């Protein structure tokens, strides 16, 4: 019986077996224990508005600042639905209004780094705190063409990691169809072991995704592979932020 072990089981906190000798021994009055249900009061839950505000305060002011590197595939194979999905992913995470609705909006001290790539990695662009509009514009206007070299782009991401890593929670988000045309995985593994500092790589698949290469990256970095084609991008980024 739970009550013999000191656990109340009755409705409202009352004792169901108050007359049991061993139950009485666990709930002794001389210890100051009141076995009446009247001493146990319910707690009024806060309103939804209060909960929303508390979540916003945590996301934008209390949690450790994040340093996110967005490595986004703009190769020819991403043309059409692939690019459209990747842009929607960026909007879900970096558009202030969309991100706020999912409680993943950037905070005052967050850093976001945008690295577009195809066969070559482009110049990294950085946004401080909530000023992400320029990154979104760059992401929307980037054409999808050329070949694909995921590993070169990730090498650029490693070179853009913060020197003061302890001040941030750092992660790399790779948005791609997973069809890298180069066999540089072994070289990248060596660089990651040297420079990666345990930063997780979260791959989000779009277009005609091939998860095989992405699973290798997840295993290497203790990251994870997500399918961004199911339309529920907010849930994906909430989980990424949960790791973050």
Residue ranges: model-predicted function:
Residues 2-14, 98-107, 112, 146-148:
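Surface-exposed patches in mature extracellular/periplasmic domains of secreted proteins
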Residues 2-68:
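Extracellular/periplasmic juxtamembrane helices and adjacent flexible linkers that interface
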Residues 69, 76, 84, 88-95, ...:
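Solvent-exposed, polar/charged alpha-helical surfaces in well-ordered, non-transmembrane soluble domains
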Residues 59-62, 95, 99-107, 159-168, ...:
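Surface-exposed acidic, glycine-flexible loop patches that form ligand/cofactor-binding
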